[in-house]
Amino acid sequence: YHGNTLGALAIGGNAWRREPFLPLPLTATGNNVMAPSDMAAGFQTIANQGLHHEPYFVEFVAKPDGTRIYTHEVTGTQVLDPGVANATIATLKGVIRSGTGSRNLRNFPRTAAGKTGTQDNNTNAWMVGFTPELTTAVWVGNPDKYLPMENIPEFVAAGVDKVIGGTFPAAIWKATMDAALFGRP
């Protein structure tokens, strides 16, 4: 897994034609080309009290009789102080309860934390969040151009004149999390 290359390819373009990643202070709110997998990997580190696990694609491989011939194992790396991660979690809970994500997430039935983000001119919109069980990142935008998501007929018909992180990305995040965690305590 190579975050920047995968990120460029994962959103539908050629890694060599994309703008380079710029380490700007507003990266987490959508001003750089980042893959949802990169955003989810960063947020899972916060959710895990600073313990980072590299993303992977295969959990296990089993024979037809159920015998496992491969199981992914990882110990993780502590990259943040747990106190710092916990303070961040406390702040990110507010985004869902009363902040920018609350329009669609105020009544989310689980303990959750997250961050919305919208790039200048509404060209990219994000919702990245987690529960104790799962971290999910949602990105809405055009993978090849910076096109403003304003007055788009399909969005307007759904009651949204201007797409921001707290609108469609938050609603998609909620629907995904509801389905993924259905039936789990």
Tell me what each language-model feature is.
Residues Y1-A40:
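Mid-domain, small-residue-enriched loop/turn segments at the edges of structured enzyme/sensor domains
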Residues V33-P185:
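A penicillin-recognizing enzyme superfamily signal
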